[in-house]
Every structure is written in C-alpha cells, then in structure tokens.
Swiss-Prot record:
Its cofactor is Zn(2+). It catalyses: GTP + 4 H2O = 2,5-diamino-6-hydroxy-4-(5-phosphoribosylamino)-pyrimidine + formate + 2 phosphate + 3 H(+). It is an enzyme of class 3 (hydrolase). Signal peptide: none annotated. This is GTP cyclohydrolase-2. GO terms for cellular component: cytosol. InterPro entries: GTP_cyclohydro_II (IPR032677), RibA (IPR000926), RibA-like_sf (IPR036144). GO terms for molecular function: GTP binding; GTP cyclohydrolase II activity; zinc ion binding. Homodimer. GO terms for biological process: riboflavin biosynthetic process. Keywords: GTP-binding, Hydrolase, Metal-binding, Nucleotide-binding, Riboflavin biosynthesis, Zinc.
Length: 199
C-alpha cells in the first residue's frame, strides 16, 4: 500500500454534497483526494469514475489554455447526474512535472513548441504521471468495476492491467477554444487521446 487514509468529511459543493476523503502518499507525502457521491458500496455495479490530475491553472485560476477546469466541472456534474460515483483528485500537477516546470513549458509553447515538445525540451517525457496511488484508492474503497470518464487511453490500460474492470469508457470532450485547440490536437495526434482534431 502506497498511501494511508488520513481524514474525511462532508463537502457541500454547488453540484451536490460529496464525501471528501484525504489520503497521504507515503513516498511523497502528497495528499490525494477522493470525492465520493452517493452509495458506491454495491460491488455488482460499475461506479462512474474520474481520475482528475491536478491543474492549478485550469481548476482554480480558470485558465482556458487547457481543458482541465472544464473537465473537472463536467465530471462532477455527470457523477451527480448518475446518482453516485467518485472523482479522484490526483495530485500530480502538470502531468507530474510540477507547477514551475509546467509554467516553463507554457513559455515554450508561447514561442511555438507543442505540449509534448515543450516537455521533451525540459527533459521530461510527454507524460510523467504514475497512477498507482489511484489504483490504491480504488482498492481501498473496494471499487472493482468502473465506468471511466476519460479521453486518455493510458488510463484505461493502466487500470485494466491492475485488475480494475472498465465496463465503459465515457468521453469527456468539453472546453475547446481558440487558446487550447492546438494543445488538444497535440494530445490526439501525439498521445493518442480520444479527441476530435479540429483546425
């Protein structure tokens, strides 16, 4: 087990009331969050699930150069609409290169590099994330079957390989605009994300 459950409390939001569970990752001391809505204890049902990687600029500062904030809001709304589900807030900012390096990558994108080229220029792979803590959270909460809100094929592969049964992948295509269209096209072209390519 790579993480420990630390605390939990009710979290009223503008979408509905969630149970917020905080976990601490032993390797990094980072706190990861599970937002649980409704009853997810019936192991016969597939739980509507979203792994949302931390994006301070999109989630909290309303940046439109990515689709993260739009996806966070949409995922919470879909979970409430479903009647139950879970959103794991995965504390690996900037595909796990950290906030400072993400802003460095933004500066490189401002002069013409795409999101993958910028990461490589800084010495990182296109995606540095490790989803093992998310798998631990699913296992801790005894979630074995899920309907996954994602456009990312890597998440599907990692979870399937870990024994989490994905009964359905649900696209989350929201928030495209003139400021992030190139970024989204790059994720489709170079990272294989299930996204429409638009110019």
């Amino acid at each position: 087990m790579k993480l420990t459950k630390i605390s939990e409390a009710k979290l009223p939001t503008s979408f509905g009331e969630f149970l917020m569970i905080v976990f601490e990752e032993s390797k990094t001391d980072k706190n990861h969050i599970a937002l649980v809505y409704g009853d997810i204890k019936d192991t016969n049902n597939s739980v509507l699930s979203r792994i949302h990687s931390e994006c301070l600029t999109g989630d909290a500062l309303f940046s439109i150069r990515c689709d993260c904030g739009f996806q966070l809001k949409s995922a919470l709304m879909e979970i409430v609409k479903e009647g139950s589900g879970i959103l794991i807030y995965h504390r690996q900012e900037g595909r796990n290169i950290g906030l400072s390096n993400k802003i460095r990558a933004y500066a490189l994108q401002d002069i013409g590099l795409d999101t993958v080229e910028a990461n490589h220029h800084l010495g990182f792979s296109a995606d540095e994330r490790d989803f093992s803590v998310c798998i631990d959270i699913f296992n801790t909460l005894n979630i074995k079957k899920i309907k996954l809100l994602t456009n990312n094929p890597s998440k599907v592969t990692v979870l399937n390989n870990a024994g989490i049964q994905i009964t359905e992948r649900i696209s989350l295509i929201v928030g495209r605009n003139a400021k992030n269209s190139k970024y989204l096209n790059t994720k489709a072209h170079k990272m294989g994300h299930f996204l429409p390519i638009e110019y």
